[in-house]
Amino acid sequence: MIIAIMIGRKGSRGFKGKNTTKILNKYCCEYPLIAAKKSKFIDKIFVSTDCPKIKKISKKYKVEFIDRPKKLANSKALGEDVFKYSYGQIIKKYKKKIEILVLLMANAPAVNKKMIDKGISILMKNKKFDSAVSTSVYNMWSPLRARKLSKKGTLIPFVPFETFGNPKTLNCDRDSQGNVYFADMSVSVVRSYCIDKMKEGLLPQKWMGKKIAPIKSWGGGDIDYAFQIPQIEYWLKNNR
């Protein structure tokens, strides 16, 4: 069985109501559900939430709901724990072998049917991969450019320049270190053992396992701030 799980809670801290904000005449949380509904592989769609509005919006997509316990419905709860709990509840109910999970987020609308089906196809065709996840190339946000504040109040490299090879080959050109692929959180297609063995996965999104294939996209990202909305609108207009 192949399933999709979308997670999203009420009470966002930074951008209030981000999961249910309107983007191009649809709610943010609708886009992942539309993509999952159109997939030719997904058997069932589940929504893990404590938000009445997300439930109301999701009903028309014929999803099944997983109520979140209070300990997983606050700002300190990790996505990995919510996915693991949701997976456990589904296993208890259906007692069927789940081969692949499509993990979605209510605040990550830059996803479509093509991306989901490509991710599933990658895992079906190549057993060496633990997962396939959507990626966007953001060279302008390379770790090479990242800084942190020192105790003296000065900006210093976040990671040693030697991490990227010979520092003499690097420069201010955003492309000098090569392409920088970010897992943009639009979709993670994972084998079930990645959830079972979550602790063994790579940081920071341990549900992806260790051997991760890219689902190449562009301009994706989960929405945490209102200023991201125009970028997502642009993506949606160009990926209908």
Give names to the regions the model predicted.
Residues 1-16:
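N-terminal nucleotide-binding beta1-loop-alpha1 segment
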Residues 21-22, 47:
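Conserved SAM-binding loop
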Residues 28-44:
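A short, N-terminal amphipathic alpha-helix
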Residues 42, 96-98, 126-129:
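Short, high-confidence coil segments that cap the C-terminus of an alpha-helix
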Residues 46, 52-102, 110-111, 115-118:
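Short phosphate-binding loop-to-helix
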Residues 55, 195-196, 229:
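A generic structural signal for short hydrophobic patches within well-formed alpha-helices
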Residues 81, 109-203, 215-216:
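Conserved core of the sugar-phosphate nucleotidyltransferase
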Residues 201-221, 226, 230, 234-240:
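Catalytic donor-sugar/metal-binding loop of nucleotide-sugar-dependent glycosyltransferases
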